[in-house]
């Protein structure tokens, strides 16, 4: 089905991104014979429309930067794929799909080194700018701790639409595959993410960010919990 024929409130919502569509079609091609692929894709499209039919309409549409590639609506599209293709997909595949959407941008920033004060301060300023966007839309409720020269950067979300959506539709089992990309993205900036909670399994999603040479990293070793979340002690 052509994307333009999908019936949903396009003033309030956005269509999945082109890179996201490409990812889903590629995975469908891996799992289904050519004669079935279009039918499976249409099922994913229809599931996406069903999901949006009773989804909140205050997320800003195209104006909100969180609704771009790999953002809230792409997560909903990936969850649509997961629902339709659960019998053939896997946790790692979903994790890989989100990585393929998010990580290309961070690979372009490989010159950034969070171990160096200049870049760490610049990263902090980027998070502060992101907070101003969150404050405008009240989607990801974000707070950023004051900057301290010799300490890790800290910010947290106390609301996450993707987590809210997953909880509403009983899809929290796949959320770790969508959240873990946060760790991989920081690693590309010579940084490490230290996290103890997410909005799926707690009241906040915490981000403590430091350089990958910082002793703080060894003090908080990473592990995967029983749900598949990358977390730290």
What label would you give each PLM region?
Residues 1-85:
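N-terminal, charged low-complexity regulatory/assembly segments
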Residues 73-168:
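Amphipathic interaction/junction segments at domain boundaries or subunit interfaces
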Residues 141-201:
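Short, hydrophobic/π-rich interface segment
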Residues 196, 202-212:
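C-terminal edge-of-domain segments
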Residues 222-233:
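Short, cationic low-complexity segments
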